[in-house]
């Protein structure tokens, strides 16, 4: 008798969706959208040591994080044009593209939708302007030594891009940080 009851209880439990599958189904019902952004690893050609421009800003959870300058493409804009514009808006630096680096592709959930985001990154060189985080999107913009920049970056994908850029620029990997 006990075996039958426990078997019935097991079947009953297994026929009920788990909280994980409920969450997955709820997530699948959210509408999706595609977003495309661009930015770059901006190199300071005049510094005593190789330096890159980093910005600090608040993420979706309100935490202060450091990242590479980047932002959404505007209507009719190429990824390269958007990268140059976003770098100037977020850092005050006038930059030119040296090389296309890589794209990062990921998903996240925001405001009742799932977002598929692609971010195109470029290696860029500062050719003018003055670094400043004086705008409403960025808390701070700073030149950071290339060898120390990866330790500041909040996102693993950006750390990988920085290591790749360093190998391309200097022929060696970044120091652990």
Where are these regions (language model features)?
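Residue-level detector of alpha-helical recognition elements and their boundaries
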Residues: 55, 98, 102, 137, ...
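Short, charged/polar low-complexity linear motifs in solvent-exposed/disordered segments
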Residues: 67-70, 114, 150, 168-171
